[in-house]
């Protein structure tokens, strides 16, 4: 059983490293960073507490929102999804991501107080 799981993981990594464009790998690294940051904040909340609750909520909402926006960007710039997003260039998708991210962080900063 564990040998088959290891073979599936190794094949996944081989195909990911050989077939995934560099832009998507960079975006995946950003997604991993956001995921780990959100998990760290949630773990801190469980261990220490949520004394400044607005600060915790702001940070966690920022992580979740940024993750969602980055996933949307990844879907739009993936070459395999080109047929679904014919009218949107990768540059336009990135500009939309920057605009939405700016709005998200303005709302988060307003929520902090």
UniProtKB/Swiss-Prot annotation:
GO terms for biological process: apoptotic process; blastocyst development; negative regulation of apoptotic process; protein glycosylation; protein N-linked glycosylation; protein N-linked glycosylation via asparagine; regulation of protein stability. Pathway: Protein modification; protein glycosylation. Residues 2-30, 74-92 are cytoplasmic. One of its GO terms (molecular function) is enzyme activator activity. InterPro entries: DAD/Ost2. The modification N-acetylserine is found at residue 2. Subunit of the oligosaccharyl transferase (OST) complex that catalyzes the initial transfer of a defined glycan (Glc(3)Man(9)GlcNAc(2) in eukaryotes) from the lipid carrier dolichol-pyrophosphate to an asparagine residue within an Asn-X-Ser/Thr consensus motif in nascent polypeptide chains, the first step in protein N-glycosylation. N-glycosylation occurs cotranslationally and the complex associates with the Sec61 complex at the channel-forming translocon complex that mediates protein translocation across the endoplasmic reticulum (ER). All subunits are required for a maximal enzyme activity. Component of the oligosaccharyltransferase (OST) complex. OST exists in two different complex forms which contain common core subunits RPN1, RPN2, OST48, OST4, DAD1 and TMEM258, either STT3A or STT3B as catalytic subunits, and form-specific accessory subunits. STT3A complex assembly occurs through the formation of 3 subcomplexes. Subcomplex 1 contains RPN1 and TMEM258, subcomplex 2 contains the STT3A-specific subunits STT3A, DC2/OSTC, and KCP2 as well as the core subunit OST4, and subcomplex 3 contains RPN2, DAD1, and OST48. This is Dolichyl-diphosphooligosaccharide--protein glycosyltransferase subunit DAD1.
